[in-house]
Amino acid sequence: MELPVKAPIPGGREISYRLETKNLSYRIGGNTPKFSNLCGLLSEKEEKVILKDVSCDARSAEITAIAGPSGAGKTTLLEILAGKVSHGKVSGQVLVNGRPMDGPEYRRVSGFVPQEDALFPFLTVQETLTYSALLRLKTKRKDAAAKVKRLIQELGLEHVADSRIGQGSRSGISGGERRRVSIGVELVHDPNVILIDEPTSGLDSASALQVVTLLKDMTIKQGKTIVLTIHQPGFRILEQIDRIVLLSNGMVVQNGSVYSLHQKIKFSGHQIPRRVNVLEYAIDIAGSLEPIRTQSCREISCYGHSKTWKSCYISAGGELHQSDSHSNSVLEEVQILGQRSCKNIFRTKQLFTTRALQASIAGLILGSIYLNVGNQKKEAKVLRTGFFAFILTFLLSSTTEGLPIFLQDRRILMRETSRRAYRVLSYVLADTLIFIPFLLIISMLFATPVYWLVGLRRELDGFLYFSLVIWIVLLMSNSFVACFSALVPNFIMGTSVISGLMGSFFLFSGYFIAKDRIPVYWEFMHYLSLFKYPFECLMINEYRGDVFLKQQDLKESQKWSNLGIMASFIVGYRVLGFFILWYRCYRTRS
């Protein structure tokens, strides 16, 4: 990518960026096989053209709006300009200041705001922007706070700075304010280029105008290059737009000023109705307008590979800057992410307050049901064995309630790591470390009443070991859910997969079916069962050298080896979850 153009532009900013596409085309399908019928015959999926020979440009100190009817390719073009498309076949050229786009350099100077906001609902506006600044800037906390304060003033969010973001129907800031916060998250590193998908979508006319006016001020005062997609612009919003790229069926039918669009409609024989703005009418008749013809250009089918961008750039005589490093070390990232996660956990009722109450109340209720069962001679072993099986079922199955939180975190993680705000490793480490003390509190709230009320072995070492097992069970199940939340596409699929596996683990734990009765081809499930090892630990802790243990083929030495196996499950699921998340983020970033 070429060194920034230095030119006197509005607002005193010396560095400017111009984006340009030449004969840009984007196709999907064609090479992806699919089953064409019930017989399983393999056929090739039909290729679909999303963009065709798109040539347009976006200049500094201007708002360029990509418009067109639904399905015209607006979002696809914007994502390509942001370097976000990770699949499909792209040909043509994407130029930044006249040179082929270089991914790392371009990522450093640009900001991309998707249509869907991805914000933590329980953080305040100021906290959201502060954590974004701490993660993306090489600066001290004091300097980050000063920058965030200025940014909040610039965004007009002073009155809601200490208000929580909120989500959906929950109390929080308005839709327009939430949209400005999303824009602010991308502005903390002061990008020269801002790309926004549907900034006015879902907003009332006043909020939509407020957002677009804010963007216009940035072009005037700071000379930023702003590209946005828009679907239904009002008169006042249209006044803020400098250039329009009108698409129809993936082709450009107009690229220029609002006035030139008016002239094209006029010369095409159309009459703009009264009280209808020119762009709104142009979108309605886009299919009848003649596409702009451009000269053919040599295809660059390797779009999306930084190697190609770099080789093109170096061959053009440019100097490649290796500035794609992160702003913080892994340790610093873990500290910042851990602090943010801690606030989210303690403010999320279903994760902390509800979970703490659930553990305390469940411990008391179970203790009252199995009251002093440990002191009963007759059928005591059967009752205690059933008690151990039940509490493990309860503890392992109740962890699925954290799945929505993990899925929300994943969405934000993928968005933040796509801009290299931090490493995936730092997120996994912070998430793991934060849950260790939190689940310790939950385990003690559950274990303390239930252990003494049931009347299990009345010795301190027995209680401490029982509490340790409960704690590790919670950590193990939490890691299991975290791992599969990285894998599944949505909450419904996640619930189905996790519940199904938990049921299988319980079935093969050795409680319902003895190990020697399990078919050979299913024995691996016995050893993978999350129920097997804690169940054996609780039995050994209660009966120790009893003849009953020998009947169950259990040895007292397994008391600690089983804990080691459970710890390896925790590490294994976290490591597997890390690789799944890393691959997801890698695909998004590429």
UniProtKB/Swiss-Prot annotation:
Gene Ontology CC, one term: membrane
ABC transporter domain ranges (all copies): 19-274
Transmembrane segments: 351-371, 387-407, 434-454, 468-488, 491-511, 563-583
Subcellular location: Membrane
SMART domains: AAA
Annotated membrane topology: Multi-pass membrane protein
Binding-site residues for ATP, renumbered to this chain: G68, P69, S70, G71, A72, G73, K74, T75
Protein name (database record): ABC transporter G family member 10
Species annotation: Arabidopsis thaliana (Mouse-ear cress)
Chain's gene name: ABCG10
